[in-house]
């Protein structure tokens, strides 16, 4: 489940109509959402609030032997007036990342506040001719998170839209030095420039850590849409991309390439009864996504296949192979949504009306029109209100299993999961005299738990089959 601050950043991207799916970093996002989901390892409580349309806060408290937590603040120059912030009103499908039914990328238009907040006098010209006087200030987002207790870590993010097709991002990570070490806190800065034209997407990166330079690119083959208009008749999309990294200090070189084939909403659209002479769709009646990634330097090859058999059921599988070591990996998973019948509320109060009145913001028809424009680019806008809970299951070739349940309990968003597998049995049987060595295979299995099952027991005791279990609770207002 997305954290509240990630949810607000997603709302910011939708408000400014920046397509996060049109990037090489999101090439395998569908398979990763279904196969690489995180299982909580402890009890964690989050309290979040979108106190004003421009400002959000979040507090986290967790325990795993030691009590730790974090404090987060976020500021956006774009008013998030129509973003649900109460945990009882946020659609669960917007927080849980599952199968992603994407739409054909659309180039940005210049006659809307793509990179700025439109002035009130220009809201009526959303669909009209070009208006260059609606720019008040650039769309900017500031986010900072402080992780406690010491050694504390500070994460900061600066995001700014500088043109219809360009966005800059700067991320900072600073860690406090240990108490006995008298030195300045270590810090690393990552700067990124993203350029998206719909057909092409390029990202240029630089990190102060080892002076790392990077580039990521994605090309949507055969896609030439008009600015501001989506291709509603296109049934599939083929994308090719690559990334490259180089560090002159450490002589580090990285290279990967990939392909993705995915169906678009037109492929699963049911023909109307009036069009009796229409031919059946040659692609498929259900959405699916295929990806192929190759890392030539390490010899790694990976393929994924994800399909949504129904609106409440999705499957995914991944097969990886290394041509140098002859090692292979096979993972399969699925997600099952459950929805209960409920009556549609007449009017929903998000609790921010007092803030709008104080800031002089009127929730008029033009503001609702902007909201409909940004939500029209979301392929899950129709079904995002459906679903009260979801179960995710993941199993690999070593029979390491992850089980996750995410749902709504009253006004709380709850995540509960467990990871288990036979890795601990093999570890203790091979090296019975070293109880701490059993944690290495567990961590290598990717279950996310570093606790050893036999760390405090005698070598002759039978280890536990459990590898990790936890619960996370979120409340937002």
Swiss-Prot record:
Transmembrane segments: none annotated. Pfam families: MDM10. Signal peptide: none annotated. GO terms for biological process: establishment of mitochondrion localization; mitochondrial genome maintenance; mitochondrial outer membrane translocase complex assembly; mitochondrion-endoplasmic reticulum membrane tethering; phospholipid transport; protein insertion into mitochondrial outer membrane. The lineage of its organism: Eukaryota, Fungi, Dikarya, Ascomycota, Pezizomycotina. It comes from the Eukaryota. This is Mitochondrial distribution and morphology protein 10. It is found in: Mitochondrion outer membrane.
């Amino acid at each position: 489940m997305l954290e509240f601050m990630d949810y607000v950043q997603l709302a910011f991207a939708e408000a400014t109509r920046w397509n996060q799916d049109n990037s090489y970093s999101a090439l395998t996002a569908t398979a990763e959402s279904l196969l690489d989901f995180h299982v909580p390892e402890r009890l964690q409580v989050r309290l979040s609030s979108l106190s004003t349309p421009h400002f959000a806060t979040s507090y986290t408290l967790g325990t795993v032997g030691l009590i730790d937590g974090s404090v987060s603040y976020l500021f956006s120059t774009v008013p998030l007036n129509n973003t649900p912030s109460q945990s009882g009103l946020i659609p669960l499908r917007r927080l849980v990342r599952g199968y992603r039914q994407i739409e054909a990328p659309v180039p940005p238009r210049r006659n809307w506040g793509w990179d700025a907040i439109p002035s009130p006098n220009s809201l009526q010209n959303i669909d009209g001719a070009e208006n260059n006087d609606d720019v008040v200030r650039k769309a900017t987002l500031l986010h900072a998170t402080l992780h406690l207790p010491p050694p504390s870590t500070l994460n900061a993010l600066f995001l700014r839209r500088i043109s219809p097709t360009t966005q800059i991002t700067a991320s900072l990570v600073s860690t406090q030095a240990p108490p006995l070490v008298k030195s300045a806190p270590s810090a690393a800065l990552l700067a990124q420039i993203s350029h998206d034209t719909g057909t092409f997407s390029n990202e240029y990166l630089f990190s102060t850590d080892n002076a790392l330079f990077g580039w990521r690119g994605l090309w949507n083959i055969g896609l030439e849409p008009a600015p501001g208009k989506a291709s509603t008749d296109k049934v599939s999309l083929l994308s090719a991309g690559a990334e490259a990294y180089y560090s002159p200090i450490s002589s580090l070189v990285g290279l990967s390439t990939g392909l993705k084939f995915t169906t678009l909403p037109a492929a699963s659209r049911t023909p109307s009864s009036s069009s009796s002479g229409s031919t059946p769709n040659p692609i498929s009646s259900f959405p699916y996504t295929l990806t192929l990634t190759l890392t030539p330097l390490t010899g790694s090859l990976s393929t994924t296949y994800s399909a949504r058999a129904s609106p409440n059921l999705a499957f995914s599988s991944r097969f990886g192979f290394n041509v140098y070591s002859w090692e292979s990996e096979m993972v399969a998973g699925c997600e099952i949504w459950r929805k209960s019948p409920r009556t549609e509320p007449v009017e929903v109060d998000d609790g921010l009306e007092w803030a709008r009145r104080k800031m002089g913001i009127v929730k008029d028809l033009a503001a609702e029109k902007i909201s409909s424009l940004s939500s029209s680019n979301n392929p899950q806008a129709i079904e995002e209100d459906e679903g009260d809970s979801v179960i995710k299951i993941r199993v690999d070739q070593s029979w390491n299993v992850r089980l996750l349940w995410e749902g709504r309990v009253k006004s709380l968003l709850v995540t509960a999961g467990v990871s288990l597998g036979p890795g601990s049995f093999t570890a203790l049987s091979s090296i019975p005299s070293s109880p701490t060595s059993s944690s290495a295979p567990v961590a290598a299995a990717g279950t996310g738990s570093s606790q050893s099952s036999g760390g405090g027991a005698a070598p002759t005791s039978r280890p536990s089959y459990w590898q990790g279990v936890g619960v996370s609770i979120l409340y937002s207002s």
